[in-house]
From Swiss-Prot:
Family the entry assigns: Belongs to the MinC family.
Source organism of this protein record: Agrobacterium fabrum (strain C58 / ATCC 33970) (Agrobacterium tumefaciens (strain C58))
Pfam families: MinC_C (PF03775), MinC_N (PF05209)
A GO biological-process term: cell morphogenesis
NCBIfam families: minC
Function, as annotated: Cell division inhibitor that blocks the formation of polar Z ring septums. Rapidly oscillates between the poles of the cell to destabilize FtsZ filaments that have formed before they mature into polar Z rings. Prevents FtsZ polymerization.
The protein's name: Probable septum site-determining protein MinC
Presence of keyword Cell cycle: yes
Keywords of the record: Cell cycle, Cell division, Septation
Amino acid sequence: MTKVLTDQRSIRIKGRSFLAVVLSPESPVDQWLERLDDLAARSAGFFLSRPVVLDVSELSLDKAGLKELLAALRERNVGIMGIEGVRPSMIEPGMPPSLKGGKPASDVEVEPVAVAAELPEDKPHASGEVRAVVQSLVINEPVRSGQSIMFPEGDVTVIGSVASGAEIIAGGSVHIYGALRGRAMAGSLGNVSARIFCRKLEAELLAIDGVYKVAEDIDDKLRGQPVQLWLENDTIKAAKLG
């Protein structure tokens, strides 16, 4: 008996981009894992339910070394969705897939509410690319605990406070017109010029271009004060505003 197909409906396959945290281990790996443990201990839940890409381009790993690293991360409940900087031949069944060419992209159109000036001409990008404008996303209300605001295209401004357990992730700078009690990550896609500004600093975690500082690292003199933070020689610097 021959089955006749009278309804030929296609299967829709969509391409979509998501913002993920990228972990870039450094040698020696044991010491890097200790620093990762320190971050996880001082910022509980940072990796919980968060997509993570493992970039091993700075390491010289064989297949066994890669498996050991993945096992060490699984023990720490860090779920790896993909691996960057690895030869496809090193990927075995059951391992996360090999990724390459990651770049920011938006799945949801966000209306730009402000446009900043062009980047200075005397500081061109090494790749020769020219970013014409930097967009800004303005949140006109406080950010509640458990909320996560991600805007890789540019700056994020919050007219209000950011509660403990909430987070702001921006490709550019972060401006908080209120108390910053949660997490703020600026320059998330690689922007050493990004800054963090807030009217009251009580943050759980701060990060600029991948360099982080947790609550215990903040100078007591700056707690509860209006503060700006910036990156200098791979170190986060902070100063009181006004």
